Amino acid sequence: MEKSLKKKIIVRGAKEHNLKNVDVDIPKDGLVVISGKSGSGKSSLAFDTIFAEGQRRYMESVSAYARQFLGVMKKPNVDYIDGLSPSIAIEQRTISNNPRSTVGTITEIYDYYRLIFAKIGKAYCPNDGRLIEEQSLDKIVNTILSYSEGSKVILFAPIVRGSKGSHKKVLEKILNQGFNRVRINSEDYLIEDALNLNLHKNKKHTIEIIVDRIKLGNNVRVRLAESIETSLAVSNGYLRVEIDNDLEKIDKLFTEHNSCPLCGFSLPLIEPRLFSFNSPFGACSECSGLGVTLEFDFESICPDTSLSFNDDAFLTFKTSSSWSVAIFKGLAKHYNFDLNTPIKDIPDKVLKQILYGSNEKIDFIYQSKEMEAKELDGGFHYSKTFEGLLPLLKRRYLATESESTKIFYENLMSKKICNSCKGKRLSVGALTVKINGKDIQDLTNLSVFDSYVFFENLQLDMVDEKISKEILKEIKSRLKFLIDVGLSYLYLNRISGSLSGGEAQRIRLATQIGSALSGVIYVLDEPSIGLHQRDNEKLISTLVNLKNLGNTVIVVEHDEQTLRTADYIIDMGPGAGILGGEIVAKGALIDILNSKNSLTGQYLSGKFKIDVPSSRRKADKGEILLLGSNKNNLKNIDLSIPLGVFTVITGVSGSGKSTLLNEVLYPALDSRLKLNEKYCDGFKDIVGYEKIDKIIQINQKPIGRTSRSNPATYVGFFTEIRELFAKLPDAKSRGFKAGRFSFNVKGGRCEKCQGDGYLNIQMHFLPDVFVPCDLCKGKKFNEETLEVRYKGKNIHDVLEMSVFEASKFFENVPKISHYLKFLIEVGLEYIKLGQSATTLSGGEAQRIKLAFELSKKSTGKTFYIIDEPTTGLHFDDIKKLLEVLQRLVSNGNTVVLIEHNLDVIKQADYIIDLGPDGGLAGGNIVVSGIPEEVAKCENSYTGMFLKNLL
């Protein structure tokens, strides 16, 4: 019995969130999938109970000193858990918003890159391409002796190299050092004769001491070494050698420094920190290792060129400033234009000189406002070369110590590629070091797959191969893990903050596989999100490999392929929120398929399904044509999106879907509809936008950054609720207005916690602890406000209701029930009205935004762009969502989705499949048309998987 217990994780009485006293035995060392409707309690069981308790027990085992760095987790609401081992959660959250954090740094691949470049990289002079290397005396001697016996060798000590001057003192010093002969400008002289040459002081000269002439043979090593040592000593470490072997004349430069012997370019010590853009030792000094700098541009400081200077066209040079007036009066006089001339009418050449400066001296006269008002002559006269408006503003920005001024300037600046390092982040010295012709940033500019190919085919000599063997092993294994989790398309220099939650999670997963731990409980949150079916197979293989290492892998997942691969399934339900929190079925796949209570099982068995539509809308209502899309990996493609139909953009991960829709199409349409073309880039032209009147982008960004933001405030019906409470007789008798029922303003809120509902307690040896406010007991409002009740419920009680409960409670209040209806339609009946925005997933935030848009009055000419709306949705929730989206289209609107879910794709009226692969191998339109046409395309991965469903 004791042995069998150790093979299970035993959970008894789990009551966290909506869990209803759940008891479950989970087999260890297997792939366990927890399924169920959105809000049914999957994450509450996996993350908030099992992982939380495993983590908490580990934390308790370390010292108080260590705990202050590790953090402390509260005990989950569960009676008993046994069989736990150390647990690791791999969640869907952005890794870091730090611009210095990249895919290469977070996977530690870049650390190994720095190491291999420091060990076997070869430095080349940036000026002449010559190999730079430190050479010892013995190495120089051996190199010269390697030439054929009998070769004539002349050793020169370079003293002056291409410098102006008569160099009299240099020649005198050479004489005093005891040398007899010199070579000056390619001519040989006795030192006495050289002193009488009277070299022209304004011309460049080269002076070398002729140290020795040697004929190579058996007994010359000692003499050669002594002469070389002398040459290096008098020339500060440089030596030039002429070798004549009768067949050819060879000219070689040697140096004992890490510098170019020809131009003198000096390189610091080659070590790993030289290649770190986070270290002042290796970072570009201009951009401090960011690769970009903040710069002013003409469009930002002069948004309306139809205005003149006197109309205050320039936001940073107003007529109210005497200095600005002085500058522009001087410029106008010098370049012959009027201060009332619209900026757009100033000649381009003149405008360029005004913006960027010139070498011409310009006369300026500064007059105070008092002198100008009295039309007095005089003032401060000065003449100088004008640096240009943009450099002047940059200088002011760098010089100011005023925080408000800095913020004002930064709002007018934009990020530009660093002019010094060209976006490579590193110093010139670091970029001179190369392996097979590539510097370290050239390698980070490659995709994960291309990087793997580069190192797999890397040819090295015997010495370098031995030095780099272990480093290469680590690099290739990490790259292979990333490929195995479907991230072959990512570039190693990609900023980690730009990764989706799914990509970030799979990077963590790849890192964990690389660590090769065993005996661990891994808890993952929908790792298949954002993955094409082709890549999903790789991901599942990775999860199985993680299990085979001797770990327990618990996955919260809706993906059918993952469910069918699982060793054990726990299906939560039967509904969401208060209607969920129970285990409706558990066991192997066959047990779930045979369960009458399992909604998941009924979809997997085919009893319930999302049908292929009997007919599809025809694309005959016009189109929007986006021509020449070329941003990121897009290959100058022409995109045609039919209006009035349901379109899905498909393609493998990294094929360019998000770039095309979110970074090119949306800004293009948004700017055209708002008559503002400033933000348009990445395409040549857009046609047909006149046929729509509004564009709405519904993404997965949070609906708010603080605990005060919630679904009720975002969608807008909290205002209606507050006004309803303010109209109650009790509220009127107390003189309460609608503002009394807001936790954001003084009056009705609890002032001890300022409407947060909790207090932040600072601990000395522990992290900050958030505890419910002891005055309002976490209710956010003061006692007087809570005494006002509607149908027996106060404002706090209402905010604690789920959307489903609230819909029943407010069914006779149309202004409120109208909004709640749409939240239910998008599958959010389980969330609370006052649930903090910080606790909502990306998918939940997106569906709240969708509900908000649905609640508005439709014009029938709206263009919707929605990015993967099925994120976090069960089969049944997807069915509901599709009904909503199809209704939007039936009302005359256009809906365009980015989606991988095949149930959604098969319902589309029109598909545009990008690819054929990810990264550089993507960016093309592989096929477009109705699903049946896409399924026939042999080059389409989407078509390959779609074929079986039609």
Curated annotation (Swiss-Prot):
Its keywords, alphabetically, are: ATP-binding, Cytoplasm, DNA damage, DNA excision, DNA repair, DNA-binding, Excision nuclease, Metal-binding, Nucleotide-binding, Repeat, SOS response, Zinc, Zinc-finger
Q: Which residues bind ATP?
A: 36-43, 651-658
Spell out the CDD domains in the cross-references: ABC_UvrA_II (cd03271)
Q: Which InterPro entries does the annotation name?
A: ABC_transporter-like_ATP-bd, ABC_transporter-like_CS, ATP_grasp_subdomain_1, P-loop_NTPase, UvrA, UvrA_DNA-bd, UvrA_inter
Q: Which GO terms describe its cellular component?
A: cytoplasm; excinuclease repair complex
Keyword DNA-binding in the entry? The reply is yes
ZnF (C4-type) ranges? 260-287, 750-776
Binding partners and assembly? Forms a heterotetramer with UvrB during the search for lesions.
Sorted alphabetically, which NCBIfam families does this protein's record hold? PRK00349.1, uvra
- In UniProt terms, what function does this protein have? The UvrABC repair system catalyzes the recognition and processing of DNA lesions. UvrA is an ATPase and a DNA-binding protein. A damage recognition complex composed of 2 UvrA and 2 UvrB subunits scans DNA for abnormalities. When the presence of a lesion has been verified by UvrB, the UvrA molecules dissociate.
The protein's name is UvrABC system protein A
User: What gene is this protein translated from?
Assistant: uvrA
